[in-house]
């Protein structure tokens, strides 16, 4: 699954959202990266996915939650989809992934942002690109 981000396009499915993160996840290489896709209230893409962090801290993605929301507000987002890649190729979310998702969802709601999804990407076959799991569809 690969796709170029088209600002102004609409995101209606988890597969469309995951496709928009592929290029930025490739840039992370063997590092775990965390990204935010800012949307308007109707699901229109306002900007390309924004890299919020790269690397690990204590074995999990090094995510400063303030940076997630700062990136969203900087472009006037009403909604966000977040994603991160698992360089290991394992799609299963960790307990830390699930905990972070719940924290982001709660804080987004408090800030008046719609938290749509958290996508995990994993490269399982270089010719294919990335597989993904949607936490909104599968876990939340």
Segments (PLM) and residue ranges:
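N-terminal beta-strand/alpha-helix entry module and adjacent surface
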Residues: 1-77, 93-115, 122-140
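Short beta-strands and strand-loop turn motifs
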Residues: 80-86
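Residues embedded in well-ordered beta-strands within globular domains across many folds
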Residues: 81, 119-120
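Conserved beta-strand edge residues that scaffold enzyme active sites
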Residues: 86, 120-122
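Short, solvent-exposed loop/turn segments at secondary-structure junctions
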Residues: 88-92
């Amino acid at each position: 699954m690969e796709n170029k981000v088209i600002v102004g396009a609409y995101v209606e499915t988890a597969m469309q959202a995951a496709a928009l993160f592929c290029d930025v996840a490739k840039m992370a290489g063997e590092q775990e990266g965390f990204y935010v896709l800012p949307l308007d209230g109707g699901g229109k893409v306002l900007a390309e996915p924004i890299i919020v962090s790269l690397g690990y801290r204590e074995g999990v993605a090094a995510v400063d939650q303030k940076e997630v929301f700062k990136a969203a507000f900087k472009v006037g987002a009403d909604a966000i989809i977040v994603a991160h890649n698992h360089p290991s190729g394992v799609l299963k979310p960790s307990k830390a992934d699930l905990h972070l998702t719940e924290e982001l969802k709660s804080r987004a709601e408090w800030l008046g942002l719609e938290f749509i999804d958290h996508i995990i990407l994993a490269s399982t076959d270089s010719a294919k690109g990335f597989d993904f799991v949607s936490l909104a569809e599968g876990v939340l």
